[in-house]
């Protein structure tokens, strides 16, 4: 889990727009966040395996 201070800092508007970055809405992870879902790859995989994200399924070929 991310520090609460870092999550609060990310929620504040950045002084410059180039400093803004995305964080996972569930765990607060700053890296590998999918913009379409707003969550990180770890949480995305967990929710997809549980079937909680409609239209998303594990690929097999």
Curated annotation (Swiss-Prot):
Gene3D superfamilies: 30s Ribosomal Protein S14, Chain N. One of its GO terms (cellular component) is small ribosomal subunit. Keywords: Metal-binding, Ribonucleoprotein, Ribosomal protein, RNA-binding, rRNA-binding, Zinc. GO terms for molecular function: rRNA binding; structural constituent of ribosome; zinc ion binding. Binds 1 zinc ion per subunit. The keyword Zinc applies. GO terms for biological process: translation. Zn(2+) binds at residues 24, 27, 40, 43. Its cofactor is Zn(2+). Part of the 30S ribosomal subunit. Contacts proteins S3 and S10. PANTHER family: 30S RIBOSOMAL PROTEIN S14 (PTHR19836), SMALL RIBOSOMAL SUBUNIT PROTEIN US14M (PTHR19836:SF19). Belongs to the universal ribosomal protein uS14 family. Zinc-binding uS14 subfamily. HAMAP family: Ribosomal_uS14_2_B. Binds 16S rRNA, required for the assembly of 30S particles and may also be responsible for determining the conformation of the 16S rRNA at the A site. This is Small ribosomal subunit protein uS14. The lineage of its organism: Bacteria, Pseudomonadati, Campylobacterota, Epsilonproteobacteria, Campylobacterales. The gene is rpsZ.
